[in-house]
C-alpha cells in the first residue's frame, strides 16, 4: 500500500490560467465541462464511459452521474450536491463497486460500449491516449496496453529514461508470479481513474451514497480500481473493502498486488508532472 503518497497538486492548480477550458453550472441541476480544441472524441469517450458504468446500476452497481449531452468541446452532466461520507455509505459503495465490476467487459482493454475512438487518461488539460484493444489475458493487457505505452510517452516527454523501461520490463517478466490466481479473473467493467476525487458523496436522494464521476472507463481488472482508491488516500477505505469482499471475495494476495496496479497511474503522474514521481515509480518497480 502506498496511501502515504499525496498528489503534488490538483489538476486544476497545475494548469491554472490556461484559457478555453473549465467547469461551470449551466442551469438548475446541470454542469458543463468544457475545453476548446479538445482531443478527438474526448468528451464522447467520457460520456459513453459514464453511461456504460451506469448500466451496471440495474445489477446493483453504484450511482453514476447522469449524462445529458456532449459535443466536441463539452460534456453536460448532472450537478451533484456533495456531502461527507459515512461508514454505511462506504460499505454500500464497496458492495456496489463489486457489482459494477461483475457487469464485465468483452475483453481486457475494451472501450465503453458504443465508442470506437481513442480513450484517454489524465487531466482535462492534458489527457493522453489510453490504448484500447481485445486482450484475452490480463498480463498482456497490462504490459502492452498500459505500462509500455505510458513509459514510452514518459520517455518521449523526457521525464522517463531507458532505465525506467528496463525496470518496467523486469516487472512485466515477473507478471505471471505477481498476478498468481488473479490472472484468471474475467475482464471487469472498471472506472479506470478511481482516486478519491472521482468519488463524490451526496445525500440528494436521502441516505448518503457514492456517485462516480470523471472515468477512464474500460475493460480491465477489478483490482485496478481498488488500487486507485488506495493510491492517494480514501476515507473509510477499510469499510469500502469490507463491503466489496462481502459481494465478491478477492483472490488471495490482492494486498500484495496493490503496488502493481498503481504503476500505471504513477507512470502517468511522471508524464504529467515529472519530479518526485519518477523516483517513486522506480522504487515501486523494484
Regions found by a protein language model. Give the residues of each.
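Hydrophobic alpha-helical segments that form the core
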Residues: 259-267
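An alpha-helical support segment within catalytic cores of ATP-dependent transferases
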Residues: 105-191, 202-205
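ATP-binding pocket architecture of kinase catalytic cores
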Residues: 29-137
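Active-site Asp-x-Gly
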Residues: 131-134, 138-143, 152, 185-189, ...
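ATP-binding glycine-rich phosphate-binding loop
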Residues: 17-26
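ATP/Mg2+ or Mg2+-diphosphate-binding catalytic cores
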Residues: 269-286
